Amino acid sequence: MSLLTEVETPTRNEWECRCSDSSDPLVVAASIIGILHLILWILDRLFFKCIYRRLKYGLKRGPSTEGVPESMREEYRQEQQSAVDVDDGHFVNIELE
C-alpha cells in the first residue's frame, strides 16, 4: 500500500460515518423541519388565494345586520344586487368597509 492510500482511507470513512449517522438528534430534527417546511410551502403555493383571503377578511361574510329593521336589510340587499348586476358580461368586485 502506498502512503497516500493509507492516509486517504480513514479520512473518507470518517466523513461517511458522520454523514450517515441518522441517530443524531440534531440530524433527525433538521430532517423533520425540512420536510415540514417543504409540505407547508407546497400547501401555501396551492392554496395561497384562499389562505390570504381568509386572513384579510376573516371568517365574516358581510356586515352584521343585528338590530337593523327588515326593510333596511331588504333595501341593502337590493342595492348590492343591482351593483353586481350592472353589466351581465363583467364581474364587479365590491369591498365593504
UniProtKB/Swiss-Prot annotation:
The chain crosses the membrane at residues 23-43. The record marks H37 as: Essential for channel activity, possibly by being protonated during channel activation, and by forming the channel gate and the selective filter. It is found in: Virion membrane; Host apical cell membrane. InterPro entries: Flu_M2 (IPR002089). The M2 protein from most influenza A strains is inhibited by amantadine and rimantadine, resulting in viral uncoating incapacity. Emergence of amantadine-resistant variants is usually rapid. Its main location: virion. Coiled coil: none annotated. The modification Phosphoserine is found at S64, S82. It comes from the Viruses. One of its GO terms (biological process) is protein complex oligomerization. The record marks W41 as: Seems to be involved in pH gating. The keyword Ion transport applies. Residues 44-97 are intravirion. Residues 60-83 are annotated as: Disordered. GO terms for cellular component: host cell plasma membrane; membrane; virion membrane. Residues 1-22 are virion surface. Keywords: Disulfide bond, Host cell membrane, Host membrane, Host-virus interaction, Hydrogen ion transport, Inhibition of host autophagy by virus, Ion channel, Ion transport, Lipoprotein, Membrane, Palmitate, Phosphoprotein, Signal-anchor, Transmembrane, Transmembrane helix, Transport, Viral ion channel, Virion. Cytoplasmic tail plays an important role in virion assembly and morphogenesis. Homotetramer; composed of two disulfide-linked dimers held together by non-covalent interactions. May interact with matrix protein 1. Belongs to the influenza viruses matrix protein M2 family. Forms a proton-selective ion channel that is necessary for the efficient release of the viral genome during virus entry. After attaching to the cell surface, the virion enters the cell by endocytosis. Acidification of the endosome triggers M2 ion channel activity. This is Matrix protein 2. It comes from Influenza A virus (strain A/Chicken/Hong Kong/YU22/2002 H5N1 genotype Z).
